Amino acid sequence: MPELTKSAILKFYKRKDIQDAIIEHALHKEIGMQFGVGNFGKRPDVLTYPRDVLELALQDVTSLHSSEEIWENPLAISSDLTKKELNNVRTGWDLILDVDCPDWEISKLTTHLFIKALKENGVTDISCKFSGNKGFHIGVPFESFPKEVAGTKTKDMFPECPKKISLYLLNIISTRYITIKDNKIVFDNTYAFSIQELKDKFGEREFLITKCVRCKKKRKV
């Protein structure tokens, strides 16, 4: 792989389409900026103009991170705000599933299964991006969700709703897409691994758990 030089980075961020795409995604979101290892910009911060992107690249910014939450004014948020106050200034949130696995093969497979579960639940507006190392970010925009759920505004159901959605998807994956066949764990009826192969990837750990169907408690077998 060719070395990622400063000139190559600047050439990339000079592109108008790249700048516009970043600014469009950053609209009404808090933007975190990292410079090098462990050096972060002030909070809260925003990106407003396309030229801001190139300016940050010139300042050696190494990564940009947008908030899941969407705000009326990102600069007005503070860690001192109560949940009620945050609800008043939050206009929505995007669902972000952060797949971070130490094994590249399993990371790709896990991402595939999450996307499959979303699609089988009628979700069509799905994004997926490589997030570095062996990880992926799966995104579903706030516009994909109903405005209210059981009389509660969806925008106010953060972070509870994303957590419940994640657990729901994990349950679908574990109960529908993973089976045991010929002493192997089979994912999506296609990808099979023996327990030893998984131990080689992840070390000694418990790969199979039996739970009671009614109470969901772990059972000894």
What are these language model-derived features?
Residues 106-124, 159-173:
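Long, well-ordered alpha-helical scaffolding segments within enzyme catalytic domains
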Residues 1-94, 101-104, 110, 148, ...:
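DNA replication initiation on ssDNA origins
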Residues 127-134, 179-189:
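Short, glycine/acidic-rich hinge or "gate" loops at secondary-structure transitions
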Residues 94-97, 125-154:
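Histidine-centered divalent-metal-coordination microenvironment in nucleic-acid enzymes
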Residues 70, 96, 99-101, 111, 115, 118, 122, 126, ...:
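Generic hydrophobic/packing signal
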Residues 79-87, 115-116, 123-131:
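Catalytic micro-motifs at enzyme active sites that drive phosphoryl/nucleotidyl and oxygen chemistry
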